[in-house]
């Protein structure tokens, strides 16, 4: 599934006209561009713009507004209205761009999976950025500005007596997360009583994975590494029951709770990384015949999927 010759990430240093043209021309399997804005409900937009159109007007996409939509396509409650619905997408060149591959569609010329370059964007309404990513970005800028001013007024910081607040030039916010989720066989549900008993007896926590669950988890960790997220581990969580084996040796009645962990990052990049990780998890487990839920409480009465 992972190919070392394929492109997975384009860093901010490479997001200029010359380098992008060289990279995308060298990878003809990347056939589309998608501009990813995140609305107030956490939905990330996705489109399929031909790569030829992007390269033809690359300066316009990079410097101007990459695309536009109307307020009915995104959740911007109280902002985009019927008589003022235009929402523009402005490319964010301060974070990594990722190539999203279709595991079921192959380029006839190269034999590789067809890829879509996903470019994170800000959603702009009336020349004001109004999306979730911009709120996080602006909040961090504001907090940094206020803290730097505070440190200059009060240079002696408790616990940091060895430095002066006046010498602090920049504050870098780092953040990390863990992703818990439930996986199950489609159209098959485990009894709540069995799930509750298994949880009380701690039968599943950090236990060995088997069958397609193990395969999917291992493939997920490999893909997180390919995208540069720095995976640290994947393991079973406290919820779930043992799956069953059918006459052909395949796992059935799978119902398990898993967790994935990867390295910390900075500000908005951390949020983008989690969106990418969710897509990777969903796609890989689907290819292995399993459904994934990131809901906080998908199964009543048993452990939910926390995040901290």
Predicted regions and their residues:
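Acidic, glycine-rich loop-and-beta core segments that form the ion-binding/anion-interacting portion
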Residues: 270-308
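Beta-rich nucleic-acid/ligand-interaction surfaces
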Residues: 18, 240-248, 255, 294-308
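Active-site proximal loops enriched in glycine and acidic residues that flank catalytic Cys/His/Asp
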Residues: 37, 262, 296-298
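ATP/Mg2+-dependent ligation/transfer catalytic cores
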Residues: 1-236, 240, 244, 264-279
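Beta-strand-rich binding-surface signature
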Residues: 32, 178, 257, 289, ...
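Short, conserved helix/loop micro-motifs enriched in His/Cys and acidic residues
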Residues: 246, 250-266
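Short, solvent-exposed loop/turn segments at the edges of secondary structure
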Residues: 114-116, 176, 253-255, 304-306
């Amino acid at each position: 599934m992972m190919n070392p010759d394929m492109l997975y990430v384009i860093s901010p240093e490479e997001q200029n006209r010359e380098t992008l043209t060289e990279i995308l021309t060298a990878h003809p399997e990347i056939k589309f561009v998608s501009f990813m804005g995140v609305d107030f409900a956490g939905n990330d937009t996705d489109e399929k713009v031909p790569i030829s159109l992007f390269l033809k007007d690359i300066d316009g996409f990079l410097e101007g507004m990459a695309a536009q939509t109307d307020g009915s396509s995104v959740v911007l409650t109280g902002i985009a209205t019927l008589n003022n619905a235009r929402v523009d997408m402005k490319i964010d060149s301060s974070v990594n761009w990722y190539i999203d591959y279709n595991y079921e569609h192959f380029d006839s010329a190269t034999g590789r999976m067809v890829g879509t370059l996903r470019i994170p964007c800000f959603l702009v309404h009336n020349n004001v950025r109004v999306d979730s990513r911009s709120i996080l970005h602006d909040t961090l800028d504001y907090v940094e500005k206020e803290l730097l001013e505070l440190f200059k007024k009060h240079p002696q910081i408790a616990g940091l007596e060895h430095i002066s607040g006046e010498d602090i030039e920049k504050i870098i916010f780092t953040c990390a997360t863990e992703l818990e989720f439930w996986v199950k066989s489609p159209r098959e549900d485990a009894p709540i009583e069995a799930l509750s008993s298994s949880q009380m007896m701690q039968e599943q926590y950090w236990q060995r994975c088997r069958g397609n669950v193990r395969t999917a988890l291992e493939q997920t960790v490999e893909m997180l590494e390919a995208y540069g997220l720095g995976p640290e581990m994947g393991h079973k969580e406290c919820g779930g029951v043992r799956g069953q084996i059918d006459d052909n040796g395949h796992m059935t009645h799978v119902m398990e709770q898993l967790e994935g962990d990867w390295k910390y990052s900075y500000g908005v990049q951390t949020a983008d990384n989690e969106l990418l990780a969710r897509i990777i998890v969903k796609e890989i487990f689907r290819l292995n015949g399993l459904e994934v839920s990131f809901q906080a409480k998908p199964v009543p009465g048993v452990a939910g999927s926390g995040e901290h």
